[in-house]
């Protein structure tokens, strides 16, 4: 299971005992043949629960408060500038966020030595599973489940967008769940502020949930990219299959237009690039499918909301706030229980001239914020 964001996966995994290091201040484990060294308050045993693209995840208990946590090890975190920047960005963002539907960061384990550390250990709240696992399981999902998952996702996203942040990588495996069906958004490593323009060329992003404007390399994208991803997730909850499982960008756009219809000239106005407009016009033309026939198992309200999310032109796509007011979510929606972020997030800590050593110093400081030197 890919729990690479470090929160999901309460079940499974053998317990592993460790040995004390650094005068008993730390405990060293051997997990899948990898060293896993954490502060001693995370008392043995620990339990491996996942291996993701960015490292190993273990479940543990904080002996100081009895809290169950997930600890994600990012090994050799500073070998690659892009990955180092991604790790710092996620730590800073999660520390800025404080919302029931966003995974909470609990600790950055302070390395034993400032001058000699290469691994980063991020501690977050432990969740039971993720939406990808649930969709792939045999567990029946009712319309009530669908409503509740969607409502929580939009509620968390409202908070994220109010901080001037775009998530940019929403997908079922980044949405963690517990046994009560409480949902939390995770993995902010690709997030950006709404004012930044970046074609995401640095990263391999999951293509299936990407909005048309990103597939067409539109640099002036908005919060609407996340709404498109939510629409893809909504459709997948009901059908139990990805809506647009494209093998490449060309097939991805083909699958999209086969469902929502080929865009007319007025729907291509947002594209600044003549090449992108020409490309879309020379593709095979498809009529719009009837969503009620395509999604027969979906309630009428869910179909209506899905149609408003899967709109080619981002300026015509429903916003998160409008979606929360949609009749489909009326039984859950309460404006007084949908908070916004008190302060916008800033990526000012990221300087183009930053080396891996600069990033290492900033992550060290983050670990000190959680684990300050004792007063003498």
From Swiss-Prot:
The keyword Phosphoprotein applies. Residues 43-329 form the Protein kinase domain. One of its GO terms (biological process) is intracellular signal transduction. Dually phosphorylated on Thr-201 and Tyr-203, which activates the enzyme. The modification Phosphothreonine is found at residue 201. Keywords: ATP-binding, Kinase, Nucleotide-binding, Phosphoprotein, Serine/threonine-protein kinase, Transferase. ATP binds at residues 49-57, 72. This is Mitogen-activated protein kinase 6. It comes from Oryza sativa subsp. japonica (Rice).
């Amino acid at each position: 299971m890919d729990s690479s964001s470090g929160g999901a996966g309460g079940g499974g995994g053998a317990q592993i005992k460790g040995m004390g290091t650094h005068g008993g201040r730390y405990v060293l484990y051997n997990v899948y043949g990898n060293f896993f060294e954490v502060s001693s308050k995370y008392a043995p045993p620990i339990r491996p629960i996942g291996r993701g693209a960015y490292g190993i995840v273990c479940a543990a208990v904080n002996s100081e408060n009895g809290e169950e946590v997930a600890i994600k090890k990012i090994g050799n975190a500073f070998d690659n500038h892009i990955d180092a920047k991604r790790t710092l960005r996620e730590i800073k963002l999660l520390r800025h966020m404080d919302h029931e539907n966003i995974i909470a960061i609990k600790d950055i384990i302070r390395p034993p030595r400032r001058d000699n550390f290469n691994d980063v250990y991020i501690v977050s709240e432990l969740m039971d599973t993720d939406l990808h696992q649930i969709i792939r399981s045999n567990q029946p999902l009712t319309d009530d489940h669908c409503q509740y998952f969607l409502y929580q996702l939009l509620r968390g996203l409202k908070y994220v967008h109010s901080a001037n942040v775009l998530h940019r990588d929403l997908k079922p495996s980044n949405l963690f769940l517990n046994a009560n069906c409480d949902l939390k958004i995770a993995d902010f490593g690709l997030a950006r502020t709404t004012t930044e323009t970046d074609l995401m060329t640095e990263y391999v992003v999951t293509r299936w949930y990407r909005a048309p404007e990103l597939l067409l390399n539109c640099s002036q994208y908005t919060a609407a990219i996340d709404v498109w991803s939510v629409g893809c997730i909504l459709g997948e909850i009901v059908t139990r299959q990805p809506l647009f499982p494209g093998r490449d960008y060309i097939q991805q756009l083909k699958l999209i237009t086969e469902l929502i219809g080929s865009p007319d000239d007025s729907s291509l106005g947002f594209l600044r690039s003549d090449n992108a407009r020409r490309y879309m016009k020379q593709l095979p033309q498809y009529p719009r499918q009837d969503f009620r026939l395509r999604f027969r198992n979906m309630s009428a309200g869910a179909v209506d909301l899905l149609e408003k999310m899967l709109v080619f032109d981002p300026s015509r796509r429903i916003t998160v706030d409008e979606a929360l007011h949609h009749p489909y979510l009326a039984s859950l929606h309460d404006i007084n229980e949908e908070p916004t972020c008190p302060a916008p997030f800033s990526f000012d800590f990221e300087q183009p001239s930053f080396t891996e050593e600069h990033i290492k110093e900033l992550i060290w400081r983050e670990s000190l914020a959680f684990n300050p030197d004792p007063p003498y």
